Amino acid sequence: MGRTLAEKVWDEHVVRSTPGEPDLLYIDLHLIHEVTSPQAFDGLRLAGRTVRRPDLTLATEDHNVPTLDWDKPIADPVSKTQVDTLRRNAAEFGVRLHPLGDVEQGIVHVVGPQLGLTQPGMTIVCGDSHTSTHGAFGAIAFGIGTSEVEHVLATQTLPQAKPKTMAVTVEGSLPDGVTAKDLVLTLIAHTGTGGGQGYIVEYRGPAIEELSMEGRMTVCNMSIEWGAKAGLIAPDQTTFDYIEGRPEAPKGADWDAAVAHWKTLVTDADATFDKEIVLDASTMTPFVTWGTNPGQGVPLGGSVPDPAQYDDPSDRIAAEKACEYMGLEAGTPMRDIKVDTVFIGSCTNGRIEDLRAAAEIIKGRQVDKSTRLLVVPGSVRVRLQAQDEGLDVIFKEAGGEWRGAGCSMCLGMNPDTLQPGERSASTSNRNFEGRQGKGGRTHLVSVPVAAATAIRGTLSSPADLEPVGSN
């Protein structure tokens, strides 16, 4: 009987399998950062253990780091302690670290792929829920807890119960102006935030195959937002072209051998999934969230829903609470919602393709006078490339802020936060209460919607903008 892509990758990494117990998986790449690693290293120290495979471990500073004045001491004492602790632990245990000021520093899920460390067929873990990003390369990648971080550091293995498999087939092609972010937000609204629970999801179909690697990473990044254990996409020529020539990619004969193996990483024709979902990309439009979880979303052309329309009492109560927290009334057109801050960045949409798309829309225009635009590249390499292309000048001339690399406003763990009651249009992945700062109100959007919103000051798409030079 045939196997799915996920089953092939999983089976290749089983070190031990005992009936009634979780499989013991070998881990090919372990990514760590300053927030979820300190206790794990303490555990190693207390037990007198070393890091078993420091060569398969990569650390970077991203969650707590400032995106301004990164060359100065970190002001927040908690953030400074976590960053300093990571540096000491990396030095003591021989782990490769890319700290602030290093040309390879950045968000861990941006750095791994851009270095070529993320490759098809791998198992990849990190103490971060958006590790699923790396599944875009045909890898099984998922977030783990701090105790599991310690286990991987000590043994390079991890006990895991084998999840079920699901196929999400996206037929057709995305219309112009509709992005991978709109696709995945549409999917989450369709399934709910628990629709993928217990599954490794394979995204497939014509619309997925047409996506760039950056777009595929956006889709896989948000797998956890609808409850999936992991999300992955079969590698193809787009994947190989992205990896080839990167610093950690195979070279010469090793490259040829790697590609030959990677081409086998596809779901067999006679394989079966435990569940299948089919969507039509051609019907999709720009999509935005209105509530306080990623599943509470509607097309940009829609309105805030009436909580009374929900048949399920728990959904109705959740909608009522979301409207209250977000300061919205049912029936309000999404395009009428005023935004205070626009954030373009994060491990979801902070890559060079995202910045190019934003700059193309913003060029020759001015940010709305009552709106702040914050553009944060996902890594130093992305920042330098954007500057080489003059993208930073476009953002600054429009009245936006051009920052250093880091997680920034995706989460309220660094200086880039919303104030209570402040409303954002954000290209990040979570819109929970307080996610971007206590009392902050977050609308998840695509890069084109974010850029257009910065210009108009209300939730908008590029189609809503006047032509450059028309005023």
Swiss-Prot record:
The Gene Ontology biological process annotation of the record reads: L-leucine biosynthetic process
Pathway-wise, it operates in: Amino-acid biosynthesis; L-leucine biosynthesis; L-leucine from 3-methyl-2-oxobutanoate: step 2/4
Protein keywords: 4Fe-4S, Amino-acid biosynthesis, Branched-chain amino acid biosynthesis, Iron, Iron-sulfur, Leucine biosynthesis, Lyase, Metal-binding
List the catalytic activities from the record. Answer: (2R,3S)-3-isopropylmalate = (2S)-2-isopropylmalate
Instruction: List the GO molecular function terms.
Output: 3-isopropylmalate dehydratase activity; 4 iron, 4 sulfur cluster binding; metal ion binding
**Free-text remark on how the cofactor is bound:** Binds 1 [4Fe-4S] cluster per subunit.
Its needed co-factors are: [4Fe-4S] cluster
Residues passing through the membrane, by range:
none
Residue positions binding [4Fe-4S] cluster? 347, 407, 410
Q: Write down the SUPFAM superfamilies for this protein, in alphabetical order.
A: Aconitase iron-sulfur domain (SSF53732)
Q: Which class of enzymes does this protein belong to?
A: lyase
The region called Disordered is annotated at: 417-443
The EC number of this protein is 4.2.1.33
Cited function: Catalyzes the isomerization between 2-isopropylmalate and 3-isopropylmalate, via the formation of 2-isopropylmaleate.
Name the family: Belongs to the aconitase/IPM isomerase family. LeuC type 1 subfamily.
Share what the entry says about its subunit structure, partners included: Heterodimer of LeuC and LeuD.
Q: Which HAMAP family match?
A: LeuC_type1
Protein name, entry field: 3-isopropylmalate dehydratase large subunit
